[in-house]
Amino acid sequence: MEHRKLIKANEVLRRCAISRATLYRLISKKCFPNQVSVTGSRSVAWREDEVQKWINERPYSK
């Protein structure tokens, strides 16, 4: 079984340099990687590789 590293919302916000509101706006528009439920807790996380891919492919605005 392949294990991927998961990162929590605060780390996603830091790496992407976006606000929590922007994160959830992107999620609602289906413009951000899917979140996954963390087994044994009520929290969610994101797959690190998918977030990094999104960052790498994100167009930069000036």
Cite the ranges covered by each PLM segment:
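Short helix-start
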Residues: I7-A9, N34-R58
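Short, charged recognition helix plus adjacent turn
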Residues: S61-K62
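Polyanion-binding surface elements
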Residues: M1-T22, N56-E57
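Major-groove DNA-recognition helix of helix-turn-helix-type DNA-binding domains
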Residues: C16-V44
